[in-house]
Amino acid sequence: MSDNDIKTFGKVATSEDKGEISDNGAFVRQQNRFTTPFGNEPGQLPVEAGRYRLIWTPLCPWATRQIIAFKLLGIGEDVISVGKVAPQRTDSGWEFSLDKDGVDPVLGIRFLPEIYAKTDPEYEGRATVPTVVDVKEMKIVNNDYHHLTKFWETVWKPFHKEGAPDLYPEDLRSEIDSLNEVIFNEINNGVYKAGFAKTQEQYELNYHLVFNRLDKLEEHLSKNRFLFGDRLTDSDIRLYVTLARFDTAYYFGFRLNKKRIRDYENLWNYSRELYSIPAFKEATDFDAIKRGYLLGATENPDNILPLGPDNSLWEEPNNRAEKFGPLKI
């Protein structure tokens, strides 16, 4: 896309370089703009089937965890419809180039920033995925990836399938919330803080932050099937989406090259067991991950796509049943 072809929409930013790099070279992720919770109280977003559309891309870990939750819980497109942008973000923003005529069939837009500018003409942040749009009002109502899965797991329970797992059980909620903060700061966002760092000091600080936490998780998962014993929870979804991208994208693109996930016995077997669950596997697109990160999110002026790694290894058997017994969700 030439400079003449780049489209802008209101004041919406087109990259992380605008407003997300601090004076000391650290990457400081933007705050979410649309954070009204779903619920049944005044001022909350009504829990109503057919009213909302979720926009995602299989590149994005924040967006992918919404799809995993939908599939585990049985929230179908008759309840919340799903639109998908291409995995390579353009200079004009996330593009609906996978759809017929390059236009989302429900929202009628070509680029995601269009509806950000329409919803809030003064918005100066990036247009991000996941984004939840109220199709009745044709405006964004939530892009709070940090809390969205918990809404699907709780207040959207009337639309869960029979026998759906309780991913956010009441007796573990405070512990899940605490662990989720650690996973976010040291793993999910930790890889970005290393990858987008503008100084050697910030890169090294976050490099060590990520691998120190991976070492602790490796030890924990030697004795526990999931992060909370035998109970699959919201925290496992959050950890998985980073682990699934690590060897393909972060090891090379974000210079996190101390070890691959497949070099950790327990993290690797844990990751492959999760991948063996249809909800996780169906939401994981390794080609989209590779193209999105290595041809879009990282500097690659010649647009050369690496051939590796061999992601067929994700299909190989894991040892979790041998250690912990048959898998039950």
Q: Predicted regions span which residues?
A:
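C-terminal alpha-helical interaction module
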Residues: M1-I329
